[in-house]
C-alpha cells in the first residue's frame, strides 16, 4: 500500500486552498457480470475554486489563482485515459503518481475531467463485486470509509471538502441501482439501463454510495408529525430475499426516526432512507447518507441467537443516528472519528433500550462493548478517546474499542455530569449550528457548556485527552461482629498505564445471600451512590452498618474503570454467582474477575468454574455469549499447556450437561449446543455432537438448521472426528456463499500439520481470496484448542511474511491477516518463544510505518498477557 497515504497537514493545506462545488460522476458498470472484465470506466467532472483568487463574474474571463496555485486530487486506478484541466490536456504519465493527480496553474474557478479504468474489488474496499453461487447473479456495492471513494472516481478525499455529487450509472438490464439520492426511472439502450441520479445534498465523499445488482426489497415510509414523508427501503440479494424480515426492520427504522427527530429536535436531512444488506462486508454496517449498507449475515437464514438479533437492532439504530451525527454534521478531520462513532454507539444503545424489546441493552453494553474497551485500553497502543490522527494509516487502525466503546461509555458519564436535559439541548444547538457542514469536538463542548453552565475543560482533559484506564478498589475494615469500621474507594493507576486519576460517579451495591444450595438467592439490600475523586474517597454511609455478603463496586455500571472488589466479596460472589437474581450485577462481578485473570491476579480455573456456574441460570443472551467466549479464551490461552487436556474435557462435559438440561428450544440451549461442538474432544462428547448433526439423537426443541449443521460439523472436524468427505458432502448440500465460506473454515480446522500448512499458503499467497472467505479461513486456521502445537511452525513464518503482506495487500486485508495469522496458543510449549519472535521483529523494524508496528505490538501485548495468566495459574497449583 505504499504511496496511498494522506497526512493531516496535507489535508488542512488543501482545505484552506480548495472549495469543491460539485462532482458529476459517470460509471459504466455494464460489464460487471462478466468476471473477465476486471475494470470499469469512470468519468469524473469536478468543479472547484481556489481561495486565493476572486471567482469570475458572468461574462468575465477566468482569473488565474496565481502562478504557484497547485493542489492534487486523489485516484486509485489501474489506468488513467485522460485528464483535462480547464480545457488543457494533462499527460497522465507526468501528473498521476502514487494515487494523486497533481493540478498546477489553477484558476479561481476550475473544471477537471478525469477518465479512468477503475478496478472491481474483492476486498470490501472501493467497488466490491460478488457473484452469488446460489444463482450466479452478480452484485456490486461501494465501501468508501476511510479513503476508498478514490478507487471509484477522482475525488478530493477528505471529510471537510463537502460537495454535491451527481451520479450517472449504467448497468445490465434487470439490475437496479441505489445511491444517496432516490433511484430515478432508467433509460434503456443496447441491453443496458442508465440511472441518472439527482444531485445530493452537500456531503463528504466517504458517505457517498453506489449499490447495483438484481437486489430484491420492500418499501415503506416514515410519516413525521409535521407531515413530512421519508421513503424507506430494505434490500438484499435475491437468494436471501425469502429470509429477510423486512417488517421488523422497517418498524424498528420508523420508530428510530421518530425517536431521533424528537430527541435531536432536527428533521432528517436527506431525501430517502434505504438499507441494503450486502455480501462479504468488512464491518457491521456503513452510514452512507440515505443509503446504508449492512453485512448480510444480519439476514437470518437460520435461527439466530437473541444476542445476534439485538446486535442487529443496535447496528440499525447506530447507522440511523449517523444521519444526523456524522453525515449532516461531519468531522473536519479524522481525529474526531471517535465523536461520530462513540455518539452513535451511545445513542443507539439508549434507543434500543427505550424503543425496542431489548430493554436491558445496557447489560449487553457492559459485557460486550465495555469489555472490548477495557481490553483495548490496556494495550501498549492505547490512545486518548480524542486521538491524535496524523494520517490515514492512523485512522485505519483506530476503528477500535476506544473509539467506539470507551468513547460511548465516557459520553454516558458526560450525560450524567451535565444532565440529560442539558446534554440533548446542547446536541440540538450543535446540529442546528453546523447542519451540512463540518465541526469539531470544541464546537460540541461549547454548546454543552453554554446550556449546562459547566466548565468542561478539566473533564475533557482527563476523560478524552488522556489515555488509559484507572482502577477502583474497595477497601473495607470490620470489627469482630462484622460491623464496618472503615470504608473507602481507592483509585490507582495500573502499572505502565498513561492514565491519571479521574473523577467518577459510582454506586456500591450491598448484596445478601438468602437460602441455601440450589435455592440460594443473592439480592441487593442497599445501595450507596457517590462521587469519587483523587486517590482515596471515604464512604461514610457504610460505616456502622453490618458488612454485606457481597459489595459490588460500580454497581449499575455507572463509570468506566477497572474494578477490584474486596477479597471477601469476590470469593462469596464467585461461589454464589448463580444466586444473583439479575444479570447486570452478576455480569459486573464476572467482568471484575475476568480483568483479574487477564492481569495475572486470579487463576483462570477459578473464573472458569464461576462462568460454568453462572451458565446454569443465565438467560441474558449477550451475557451467555460473552461468558462462552471467555471460557474459550481460558481453555485455548490462559490455562497452562499441561492443564488444558483435563480442563477442556471437564468443561465440555459440563457444557454437554447444561445443553441437555436447558429449556427446550431456548436461546441458551442453542448457544450451549454450539459451545459443546466447539470444545468436544472425548468419544462421548463427539458422539453426542455427531448424533445432533445426523438427527439420530435429537435434543427436544433444537432445530438443526443449515447454520447449526456447519457449527456441529466444524466442531467434529477440529476434534478429528470428521474430514474432507463430510466437508464436501455438506458443501454440496449448501450451495450458497455461506456454504462456501464455512467449507473453507472447516478445511482450515482439520487438525493436521498438512491442513494448517495448506491454509497458511492460501492465506498468504492467494491475494484473490474474497475478504469473508479469508475471515472464515483464518478462524479455522486458529482453531487449535485441542492441539496448539500445530501452530508452532508459523511463529517464524509470521515473522518472515509480515513485511510482504503489508506491502502487497490493501490496508484492510493486511490488517486482517497480520492480526489473525498470529496466535498465542503455543505459549508455554517447551522450546517455543513466541514473545521473543515478536520482540525481535519489532527491534528490527523500528522504522516501519506506525500502523504496521501497532498491529504487531498488539499481538505481542496479547501474547505477554497469555504468559502472565499461565504463570498465575501455575503458581496457584
Regions inferred by a protein language model and the residue ranges of each:
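N-terminal, polar/Ser/Thr-rich
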Residues: 1-41, 53-54, 133-139, 157-159, ...
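Non-catalytic accessory/interaction domains
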Residues: 2, 58-64, 168-171, 176, ...
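Glycine/proline-rich low-complexity spacer/linker segments in large multi-domain proteins
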Residues: 8-17, 115-166, 213-221, 557-583, ...
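Hydrophobic helix-coil surface modules that form long, contiguous segments used
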Residues: 42, 147, 155-317, 346, ...
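Short, hydrophobic/aromatic-enriched beta-strand segments in well-ordered soluble domains
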Residues: 42-48, 75, 109-123, 165-173, ...
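A surface-exposed beta-strand-loop module
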Residues: 53-54, 66-67, 71, 75-133, ...
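Short coil-to-beta strand junction motifs in C2/discoidin
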Residues: 74-79, 161, 499-506
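Hydrophobic alpha-helical and helix-loop surface patches within well-folded domains
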Residues: 197, 228, 233-497, 633, ...
Amino acid at each position: 500500500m505504499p504511496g496511498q497515504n494522506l497526512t493531516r497537514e496535507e489535508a488542512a493545506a488543501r482545505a484552506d486552498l480548495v472549495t469543491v462545488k460539485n462532482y458529476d460522476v459517470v460509471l459504466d458498470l455494464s460489464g460487471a457480470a462478466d468476471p473477465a472484465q476486471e475494470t470499469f470506466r469512470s468519468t469524473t467532472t469536478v468543479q472547484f475554486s481556489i481561495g486565493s483568487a476572486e471567482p469570475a463574474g458572468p461574462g468575465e474571463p477566468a482569473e488565474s489563482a496565481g502562478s504557484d496555485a497547485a493542489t492534487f486530487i486523489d485516484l486509485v486506478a489501474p489506468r488513467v485515459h485522460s485528464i483535462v484541466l480547464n480545457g488543457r490536456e494533462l499527460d497522465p504519465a507526468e501528473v498521476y503518481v502514487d494515487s494523486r493527480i497533481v493540478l498546477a496553474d489553477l484558476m479561481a474557478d476550475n473544471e477537471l475531467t478525469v477518465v479512468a479504468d477503475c478496478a472491481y474489488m474483492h476486498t470490501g474496499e472501493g467497488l466490491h463485486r460478488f457473484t452469488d453461487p446460489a444463482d450466479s447473479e452478480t452484485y456490486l456495492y461501494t465501501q468508501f470509509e476511510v479513503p476508498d471513494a478514490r478507487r471509484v472516481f477522482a475525488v478530493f478525499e477528505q471529510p471537510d471538502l463537502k460537495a454535491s455529487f451527481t451520479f450517472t450509472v449504467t448497468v445490465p438490464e434487470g439490475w437496479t441501482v441505489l445511491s444517496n439520492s432516490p433511484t430515478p426511472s432508467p433509460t434503456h439502450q443496447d441491453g443496458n439501463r442508465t440511472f441518472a441520479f439527482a444531485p445530493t445534498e452537500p456531503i463528504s465523499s466517504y458517505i457517498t454510495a453506489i449499490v447495483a445488482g438484481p437486489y430484491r426489497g420492500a418499501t415503506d415510509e416514515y410519516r413525521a408529525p409535521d407531515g413530512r414523508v421519508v421513503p424507506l427501503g430494505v434490500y438484499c440479494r435475491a437468494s436471501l430475499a425469502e429470509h429477510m424480515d423486512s417488517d421488523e426492520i422497517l418498524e424498528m427504522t420508523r420508530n428510530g426516526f421518530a425517536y431521533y427527530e424528537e430527541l435531536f429536535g432536527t428533521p432528517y436531512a436527506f431525501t430517502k432512507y434505504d438499507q441494503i444488506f450486502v455480501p462479504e462486508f468488512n464491518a457491521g454496517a456503513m452510514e452512507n447518507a440515505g443509503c446504508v449498507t449492512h453485512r448480510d449475515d444480519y439476514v437470518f437464514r437460520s435461527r439466530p441467537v437473541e444476542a445476534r438479533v439485538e446486535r442487529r437492532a443496535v447496528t440499525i439504530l447506530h447507522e440511523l443516528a449517523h444521519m444526523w451525527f456524522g453525515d449532516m454534521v461531519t468531522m473536519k478531520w479524522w481525529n474526531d472519528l471517535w465523536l461520530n462513532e462513540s455518539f452513535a454507539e451511545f445513542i443507539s444503545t439508549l434507543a434500543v433500550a427505550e424503543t425496542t424489546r431489548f430493554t436491558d441493552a445496557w447489560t449487553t453494553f457492559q459485557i460486550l462493548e465495555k469489555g472490548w474497551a477495557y481490553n483495548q485500553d490496556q494495550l501498549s497502543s492505547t490512545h486518548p478517546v480524542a486521538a491524535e490522527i496524523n494520517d490515514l494509516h492512523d485512522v485505519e487502525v483506530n476503528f477500535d474499542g476506544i473509539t467506539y466503546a470507551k468513547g460511548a461509555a465516557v459520553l454516558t458519564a458526560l450525560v450524567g455530569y451535565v444532565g440529560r436535559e442539558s446534554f440533548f439541548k446542547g446536541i440540538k444547538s450543535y446540529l442546528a449550528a453546523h447542519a451540512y457542514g463540518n465541526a469539531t469536538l470544541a464546537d460540541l463542548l461549547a454548546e454543552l457548556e453554554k446550556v449546562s453552565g459547566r466548565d468542561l475543560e478539566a473533564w475533557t482533559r482527563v476523560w478524552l485527552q488522556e489515555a488509559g484506564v484507572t482502577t477502583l478498589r474497595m477497601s473495607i475494615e470490620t470489627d469482630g461482629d462484622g460491623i464496618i469500621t472503615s470504608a473507602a474507594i481507592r483509585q490507582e493507576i495500573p502499572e505502565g498505564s498513561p492514565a491519571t486519576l479521574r473523577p467518577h460517579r459510582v454506586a456500591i451495591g450491598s448484596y445478601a445471600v438468602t437460602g441455601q444450595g440450589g435455592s440460594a438467592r443473592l439480592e441487593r439490600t442497599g445501595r450507596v451512590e457517590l462521587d469519587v475523586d483523587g486517590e482515596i474517597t471515604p464512604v461514610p454511609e457504610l460505616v456502622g452498618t453490618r458488612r454485606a455478603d457481597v459489595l459490588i463496586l460500580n454497581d449499575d455500571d455507572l463509570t468506566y474503570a477497572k474494578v477490584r472488589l474486596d477479597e471477601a466479596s469476590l470469593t462469596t460472589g464467585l461461589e454464589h454467582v448463580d444466586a444473583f437474581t439479575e444479570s447486570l450485577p452478576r455480569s459486573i462481578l464476572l467482568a471484575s474477575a475476568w480483568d483479574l485473570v487477564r492481569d495475572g491476579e486470579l487463576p483462570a480455573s477459578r473464573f472458569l468454574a464461576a462462568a460454568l456456574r453462572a451458565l446454569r441460570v443465565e438467560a441474558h443472551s449477550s451475557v451467555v455469549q460473552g461468558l462462552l467466549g471467555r471460557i474459550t479464551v481460558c481453555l485455548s490461552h490462559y490455562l497452562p499447556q499441561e492443564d488444558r487436556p483435563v480442563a477442556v474435557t471437564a468443561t465440555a462435559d459440563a457444557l454437554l450437561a447444561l445443553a441437555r438440561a436447558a429449556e427446550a428450544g431456548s436461546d441458551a440451549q442453542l448457544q450451549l449446543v454450539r459451545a459443546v461442538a466447539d470444545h468436544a474432544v472425548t468419544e462421548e462428547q463427539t458422539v453426542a455432537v455427531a448424533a445432533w448433526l445426523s438427527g439420530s439423537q435429537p435434543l427436544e426443541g433444537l432445530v438443526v438448521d443449515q447454520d447449526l449443521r456447519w457449527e456441529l460439523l466444524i466442531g467434529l472436524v477440529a476434534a478429528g472426528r470428521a474430514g474432507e468427505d463430510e466437508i464436501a458432502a455438506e458443501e454440496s448440500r449448501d450451495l450458497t456463499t455461506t456454504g462456501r465460506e464455512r467449507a473453507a473454515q472447516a478445511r482450515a480446522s482439520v487438525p493436521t500439520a498438512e491442513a494448517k500448512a495448506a491454509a497458511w499458503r492460501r492465506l498468504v499467497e492467494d491475494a484473490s481470496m474474497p475478504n469473508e472467505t479469508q475471515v472464515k479461513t483464518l478462524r479455522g486456521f486458529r482453531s487449535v484448542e485441542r492441539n496448539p502445537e500445530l501452530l508452532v511452525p508459523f511463529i517464524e513464518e509470521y515473522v518472515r511474511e509480515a513485511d510482504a503482506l503489508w506491502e502487497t495487500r490493501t490496508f484492510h486485508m493486511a490488517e486482517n491477516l497480520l492480526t489473525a495469522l498470529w496466535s498465542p496458543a503455543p505459549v508455554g510449549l517447551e522450546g517455543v518463544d513466541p514473545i521473543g519472535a515478536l520482540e525481535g521483529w519489532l527491534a528490527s523494524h523500528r522504522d516501519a510505518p506506525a500502523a504496521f508496528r501497532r498491529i504487531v505490538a498488539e499481538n505481542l501485548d496479547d501474547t505477554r498477557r497469555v504468559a502472565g495468566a499461565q504463570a498465575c495459574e501455575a503458581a496457584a497449583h
